[in-house]
Amino acid sequence: MPDKAGRKMQVAIVGSGNISTDLLYKLLRSEWLEPRWMIGIDPQSEGLARARTLGLETSHEGVDWLLARDELPDMVFEATSAYVHRDAAPRYAEAGIRAIDLTPAAVGPGVIPPANLREHLDAPNVNLVTCGGQATIPMVHAVSRVVGVPYAEIVASVSSASAGPGTRANIDEFTKTTSKGVETIGGARRGKAIIILNPADPPMIMRDTIFCAIPEDADQDAITASIKEVVAQVQTYVPGYRLLNEPQFDPPSVNSGGQALVTTFVEVEGAGDYLPPYAGNLDIMTAAATKVGEEIAAKLAGASLSASSGGRS
């Protein structure tokens, strides 16, 4: 739907790689957002070529070209690298352009839609944390809103084939940013994140394991219900997100530091818009980015999309 003036938000995609191209296909379906520009640095980029055939203005001259236009976007989606976004973010802010950051730069607040999106709809720059964070932090949030979680650990296993040079170059930032998100967004007092690049061929879809320490007398039924509710919320924008089985509860043991545990297993199958379905780790980022952009546009138009955009009470 358009804004109060009857106009969709005009958006630019900065970056022309696989993630940006997949994001483009999602944005083209949006009732709230209209992709107008795609910016890259490689004139031979397949992403730029596809964008041109779909009617977008494109350039391989980077952010300088975009910001020199007579008409500027209302919003940019940046899928480059952390250091590139850190340089560009102040320029977007100076130009009055909202930014949705798909890199680990974390210039703005981290956003996981079911957990805290409503808190940050007015922020000029929001960060999508990481693919592992988008897949696992909702589950930590689901537990922590029922009981205290002194410690949470997530293990994200993704196909090696889906991990491009950007992902590999950002492994350290992935673990730091995801661990911080487990704490500040997920609600765990202490968090840890591990990523595994699975070399299996044919490629395996993204699978994640989420361990949460909980009190021994925690209400297991309430925790299970909360987990399933949040899974359903994620599925509104990532249909391929699902529980592999029921949450597993274990009593305190030496191995768990004397604490009870709930373990959740999820998998993420991509929609196959541009990326293959096994690349759920990338698809969940582009889907979450689209969700965040649409919610921002809806708020500016005085509307509300759904109840799946979390906010802590």
Curated annotation (Swiss-Prot):
<protein>
    <recommendedName>
        <fullName>Acetaldehyde dehydrogenase 1</fullName>
        <ecNumber>1.2.1.10</ecNumber>
    </recommendedName>
</protein>
<dbReference type="InterPro" id="IPR003361">
    <property type="entry name" value="Acetaldehyde_dehydrogenase"/>
</dbReference>
<dbReference type="Pfam" id="PF09290">
    <property type="entry name" value="AcetDehyd-dimer"/>
</dbReference>
<dbReference type="InterPro" id="IPR015426">
    <property type="entry name" value="Acetylaldehyde_DH_C"/>
</dbReference>
<feature type="binding site">
    <location>
        <begin position="162"/>
        <end position="170"/>
    </location>
    <ligand>
        <name>NAD(+)</name>
    </ligand>
</feature>
<dbReference type="InterPro" id="IPR000534">
    <property type="entry name" value="Semialdehyde_DH_NAD-bd"/>
</dbReference>
<dbReference type="GO" id="GO:0051287">
    <property type="term" value="F:NAD binding"/>
</dbReference>
<keyword id="KW-0560">Oxidoreductase</keyword>
<feature type="binding site">
    <location>
        <begin position="16"/>
        <end position="19"/>
    </location>
    <ligand>
        <name>NAD(+)</name>
    </ligand>
</feature>
<keyword id="KW-0058">Aromatic hydrocarbons catabolism</keyword>
<dbReference type="GO" id="GO:0008774">
    <property type="term" value="F:acetaldehyde dehydrogenase (acetylating) activity"/>
</dbReference>
<dbReference type="InterPro" id="IPR036291">
    <property type="entry name" value="NAD(P)-bd_dom_sf"/>
</dbReference>
<keyword id="KW-0520">NAD</keyword>
<dbReference type="GO" id="GO:0009056">
    <property type="term" value="P:catabolic process"/>
</dbReference>
<comment type="similarity">
    <text>Belongs to the acetaldehyde dehydrogenase family.</text>
</comment>
<feature type="binding site">
    <location>
        <position position="281"/>
    </location>
    <ligand>
        <name>NAD(+)</name>
    </ligand>
</feature>
<feature type="active site" description="Acyl-thioester intermediate">
    <location>
        <position position="131"/>
    </location>
</feature>
